[in-house]
A protein has these predicted regions:
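Non-catalytic nucleic-acid-binding/docking modules located in mid-to-C-terminal regions
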Residues: 48-50, 121, 142, 159-289
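Noncatalytic, basic helical substrate-engagement surface that gates or grips nucleic-acid strands
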Residues: 1-129, 133-155, 159, 237-240, ...
């Protein structure tokens, strides 16, 4: 069985910023919807999945926000032009037969992680479509990340499997969280250790294996005095960053095989909505004509 899991917020965000604002004659924004559905069609062609789940974040604070007040505190809110499109996108996905999944108090990342773990337990293939590099820690023999990226000014999907992680970072996928706990993450406002950037964090993890391994070898001569000083001062922040950055695999969602089989949906409603949105070109591409 092959499961495709789409990080709904991430891909919608990519679609929104990757396509100029489009509106209907009566002023409804449509660029994120149009871009998302085009990406969905490309993913279906590339993965040929048996089941599809689309994970979305909820507005409610997650366990990470409750753990650390600063978590994602520097992020700007969703642009209103995108926010207006999100409920319409979800309605369209349902009409097309695709199941969306959310979990209060959890992030879409954790839904991806939970479904990937369920697939691994069954030895099923799982494809995670996202623009968020955090999900690379989930890559395994059964899980491949399809990373939406901008290469040479053009949007494309980069396939990240175990070999690709080895080639790019020189470590195992699961060790990427060890790197993040040291370097932090400005986009999520995860603190990390002061003065430790990606290059140094990677080198430390390549040498000592993990955050725990780094702290077990603080007196090793390969750790520079200034690095040692920062590591000692910021150990609580590094440990907090490790917890915040680790994608969970136990979100309270359906994980049984068959839970995300594409249904009949409501084709007539999908056609009406696409016509209202003046996205006529997608009607035949989804087999709705």
């Amino acid at each position: 069985m092959r499961l495709l899991v789409i990080d709904g917020n991430s891909i919608a965000n990519r679609a929104f910023f990757g396509i100029k604002l489009l509106t209907t004659k009566d002023g409804r924004y449509t660029n994120a919807i149009y871009g998302f559905l085009n990406i969905l069609l490309s993913l279906l062609k590339e993965c040929e999945p048996d089941e599809v789940a689309v994970a979305f974040d909820l507005k409610a604070p997650t366990f990470r926000h409750k753990m650390y007040d600063g978590y994602k505190a520097t992020r700007h809110g969703m642009p209103e032009e995108l926010a207006q499109q999100m409920p319409v996108l979800k309605e369209l996905l349902a009409d097309l037969g695709y199941r969306t999944v959310t979990a209060e108090g959890w992030e879409a990342d954790d839904i991806l992680g939970t479904l990937a773990a369920a697939c691994a337990a069954r030895k099923d293939d799982c494809f995670l479509a996202t623009g968020d590099r955090d999900s690379l820690q989930l890559v395994s023999d059964t899980t491949t990340v399809l990373l939406a990226a901008t290469v040479m000014g053009r949007s494309k999907t980069v396939t990240m499997d175990v070999d690709a992680i080895h080639e790019k970072y020189g470590i195992e996928p699961r060790q990427l969280i060890e790197v993040k706990s040291l370097m932090g993450d400005t986009s999520d406002n995860i603190p990390g250790v002061k003065g430790i950037g990606e290059k140094t964090a990677l080198s430390l993890v390549q040498t000592f294996g993990s955050l725990e391994g780094v702290y077990a070898n603080l007196n090793d001569k390969r750790i520079k005095p200034k690095q040692r000083e920062h590591l000692m001062e910021d150990k609580p922040m590094a440990e907090l960053s490790h917890t915040l950055g680790t994608i969970r695999t136990d979100a309270p969602i359906d994980t049984a095989e068959g839970s995300y089989a594409v249904g009949e949906g409501n084709k007539a409603a999908a056609v009406r909505l696409l016509q209202e949105l003046e996205i006529h070109s997608l009607i035949p591409r989804f087999g709705l004509d």
